[in-house]
Design a protein with these regions (language model features):
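Hydrophobic positions on the alpha1 helix immediately C-terminal to the Walker A/P-loop
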Residues: 486
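Extended, folded cores of ATP/NTP-driven motor/assembly subunits in large transport
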Residues: 2-438
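The conserved Walker
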Residues: 467, 479
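Post-Walker A helix-loop "phosphate-sensing" segment adjacent to the P-loop in P-loop NTPases
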Residues: 493-504
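Hydrophobic anchor at the beta1->P-loop junction of P-loop NTPases
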Residues: 475
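Conserved lysine of the Walker
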Residues: 483
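A short helix-turn-beta junction within AAA+ P-loop NTPase domains corresponding to the substrate/partner-engaging
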Residues: 521-524, 733-746
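P-loop NTPase motor domains
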Residues: 83, 90-109, 120, 287, ...
Length: 825
């Protein structure tokens, strides 16, 4: 066995000790030697069986997912999710290593553990025919069809035609299934709690799910058609009848290194050797191959007392070897202190291993590593085997075919918790835990929108923000980074994926009008001379709320408006001004209620002028231009409603100071719309471009943060869009909003913004590189709760590209072509 070590100081450095000193696993003395011998006998009988049902490696499968592997042995399978490991910070990776170490150390010596990562291909008849977005309304049917075509084409570029799953199967001894249930339940609970420490969700598979997984390994490519209703005392059918192949040939065309199952060819390879360093990425390198794969690690814990005795025996043996070498040297006249380097090195390793077992919470395991792949032809199988072995060799892992042992190997790869292959070695806890099952993280949520392709694997990145506990989020990037393209794409995603929801856009630059028009939405322009009127004191949509609640909300809104009007607003409103404003808001509502109407800014302005304090006159003077003259479109009863499913509020005609005033007024309209009792069944998606402008005034920030915090409870999903975030993140309220959000789409950042995001989101050096100055437009980092995926995007030109594109040269060229076509007509 080659010398191998892990690259962490607190981990065993040279697992080669195990190979050099311990050799194979035949010397192990088990306390339950009789039981193990009986299990080995049954395994041999199963492997030799010529009857298919007797060959398949379990006796019974129960509805709850517990399998009787053989008499006295029962197993259960837990599926667990991926985590951002490969690009995570050093501290996060070390935490994951510690958790995986504690997970393996948890299992007792009488159990068996099987860790698997499976790349399962989607059915062939679904490739290229997947429906990502339903046609929906007539206005969007053509866009949905085009979108589906493009995404189906892109599926073939990565491994999106494969579905990756991770499983942990554990087997225990028990007299019968009733005795096994509490044992397995306790293990399941402890496993789920342990994995949760690294934000890894897990769940136990039920019987039907385990059978489907078994069939996928025994009969690759076949469709699962099992139902418990098909089993009955009269039918005589067994669960095995639905998962086992009709034919198995372990010498296809005279070969001994593969097999044929129902017309498909498969091969199982074994891990024979490790390099001088066990790389934590070696499993990920194999798993990320765009191939159907099953990577299986069988781990059999050894009792600590037995492991210590085993190592001590090997040390005693080496001491004897050293004495023999020294005596021989004396007889031949050599220096007896000069020992063969290999023997001296082995003795040092053995003593180091003994120290790890005694003092550093390490245990010893019998380890078997298997890699299983399959194909429709022998030629394709050979190519896939060559790919796997080449990648493994690049990671200094020796994979070899199991000649004449494919029969045993095929029974060892299904998730049953039973190993029929005798190619094994001893590894310690650290060496097993280093073999991380986490590859390039994928995000493929059914019903989600498209955000690009994984930069690591080429997979489609599909995210459904409605699944998040806090779906609020931010899309940020420098000008030219692809930020606007991403936002327009997400708006299209939302419209197509969630036809029952509403979309509202705050458009300070006037760039979303074409998209909204194409999606069948309404554009509302707020500017001098336009017909649209927004009343910030409107309460029409919250008429059923108590008067005190309505007044409190409107007071907050007017305080925010007043703060935005103040030149010294960055310091906030003085308490005296706050009291005057609150008093006048109440008086405006009371006076107008007598006439049975809602107050306007003019009524509020009149109430200010009637106050005795000189500060009231100053506040009234600030509002005067919004009550009289060209900017008076905020003084009147609202004639703008969110009746259309998609509404774009175009504010590019407003000046910078007035734009914040307009945003707050529009926010009030949205808040009136969503904060109703009981909450509306559908969601409202709010996209706020140039959101950083709302963080210049403390009172405005307080108002916006409250809406951000409370709106989620009423089905409001906010997205802040910004090209300059370092100033925004310097605000304490803004930081709280970021910390309470779970969705971030970050493109290329300036140095200051990059540092701010890295601190807020605890980005690793690798993750910083995904949004650094060297990335191309469209590239970035998508964060959805605990999932972090680097993205890239090369979206083909066409109708959708034209709707989303904001590159000035391409937009100008497109407009010239359109004008030329119109001139010809």
């Amino acid at each position: 066995m080659s010398r191998a070590r892990t690259n962490k100081e607190n981990r065993p450095k040279r697992p080669s000790t195990l190979g050099l000193l311990l050799g194979g696993t035949g010397g192990r003395k088990d306390a339950s030697k009789g039981a193990e011998a009986e299990r080995q006998r049954r395994r041999r009988e199963r492997d030799r069986s010529r009857e298919m049902a007797a060959y398949v490696g379990y006796d019974a499968m129960y509805r709850d997912g517990i399998a009787q592997v053989m008499p006295g042995m029962f197993s259960q399978t837990v599926e667990f999710s991926d985590i951002s490991y490969q690009s995570a910070r050093k501290e996060a990776r070390e935490t994951a290593f510690t958790v995986m170490s504690s997970l393996f150390n948890y299992f007792p010596a009488d159990s068996h553990v099987q860790l698997q990562v499976v790349n399962a291909p989607i059915p062939a008849d679904e490739v290229g025919r997947k429906v990502f977005f339903e046609p929906g309304e007539r206005a969007t049917a053509g866009l949905a069809a085009e979108y589906n075509r493009i995404l189906n084409d892109k599926m073939r570029e990565g491994v999106s035609n494969l579905v990756r799953h991770r499983y942990l199967t554990y087997a225990v001894g028990a007299d019968d299934v009733d005795a096994a249930v509490p044992k397995l339940a306790r293990i399941r609970g402890d496993v789920e709690q342990t994995l949760a420490r690294i934000r890894c969700s897990s769940r136990a598979l039920d019987g039907a799910e385990r059978l489907e997984l078994l069939q996928g390994q025994l009969r690759p490519g076949s469709r699962f058609e099992f139902s418990w209703d098909k089993l009955s005392p009269t039918s005589g059918a067994r669960t095995k009848d639905f998962v086992m192949p009709s034919t198995l040939d372990f010498k296809p065309e005279g070969r001994s290194d593969c097999f044929r199952s129902d017309g498909r060819y498969g091969a199982v390879l074994a891990v024979r050797s490790f390099g001088s360093v066990i790389e934590e990425t070696y499993l990920a390198s194999i798993i990320d191959l765009p191939l159907p794969l099953n990577v299986t690690l069988h781990v059999q814990p050894i009792a600590q007392s037995e492991a210590l005795a085993l190592v001590k025996r090997q040390i005693d043996w080496m001491d004897k070897e050293i004495i023999d070498e020294q005596m021989s040297a004396v007889k031949k006249g050599y220096d007896y202190q000069i020992l063969p380097p290999e023997l001296r090195f082995s003795k040092e390793e053995a003593e180091e291993l003994l120290d790890f077992l005694r003092n550093k919470s390490e245990r010893l395991f019998v380890y078997t590593g298997l890699v299983y792949t399959w194909a429709d032809s022998l030629e394709e199988l050979d190519r896939r085997v060559q790919q796997v072995t080449s990648v493994a060799q690049g990671c200094t892992i020796g994979l070899e075919p199991l000649h004449f042992r494919q029969r045993q190997a095929l029974n060892s790869v299904p998730p049953l918790g039973d190993n029929h292959v005798t190619v094994s070695r001893y590894l310690t806890t650290g060496q097993v835990a280093m073999q991380m099952p986490f590859a390039s993280q994928s995000l493929d949520e059914a019903g989600g929108g498209y955000y690009g392709q994984s930069k690591e694997s080429g997979n489609l990145v599909l995210c459904d923000r409605k699944r998040l506990a806090s779906p609020m989020g931010f899309v940020c990037g420098k000008p030219g980074s692809g930020k606007s393209f991403s936002v327009k794409r997400e708006i299209t995603n939302t419209v197509l994926a969630h036809p029952e929801d509403e979309v509202v856009i705050f458009d300070p630059a006037g760039e979303y009008g074409n998209l909204v028009g194409a999606l069948g939405g309404a554009n509302v322009e707020l500017a001098p001379g336009c017909s649209a009127v927004l009343n910030p004191l409107d309460t029409a949509d919250v008429a059923d709320r108590a008067d005190a609640a309505k007044l409190a909300y409107k007071t907050d809104a007017v305080l925010a408006l007043s703060s935005a009007l103040m030149a010294e607003g960055r310091e906030g409103l003085p308490e005296r001004d706050r009291s005057i404003i609150a008093r006048c808001v109440g008086e405006a509502y009371r006076e107008c209620a007598k006439d049975g109407r809602l107050p306007t800014l003019g009524d509020f302005h009149a109430a200010l002028l009637a106050q005795p304090e000189p500060e009231a006159a100053d506040i009234a003077l600030r509002y005067e231009r919004y009550v009289k003259g060209a900017f008076s479109f905020f003084n009147g009863q609202s004639n703008v409603a969110l009746d259309n499913r998609i509404t774009n509020i175009d504010m590019h005609g407003l000046g910078q100071n007035m734009r914040v005033f307009g945003m707050i007024t529009a926010l009030e309209m949205v808040r009136n719309r969503v904060m109703v009792t009981p909450p509306r069944p559908n969601y409202t998606w709010l996209y706020i471009d140039e959101v950083q402008s709302l963080f210049a005034h403390p009172t405005v920030v307080e108002y916006f943060a409250r809406l951000w915090r409370e709106g989620r409870k009423f089905g409001l999903i906010c997205t802040g869009i910004s090209q300059n975030t370092s100033h925004m993140l310097a605000n304490a309220e803004a930081r709280d909003m970021v910390l309470n959000s779970e969705f971030f789409l970050l493109h290329k950042q300036s140095t200051a913004d990059l540092d701010a995001w890295a601190e807020m989101l605890q980005l690793s050096a690798t993750e910083r590189g995904y949004i650094g100055d060297a990335v191309k437009p469209g590239e970035g980092l998508l964060i959805s709760a605990g999932i972090r995926v680097p993205i890239t995007d090369d979206f083909p030109k066409g109708p959708l590209y034209d709707l989303w594109n904001t590159k000035p040269a391409e937009v100008a060229e497109r407009e010239m072509r359109r004008a030329a076509r119109e001139a010809e007509e």
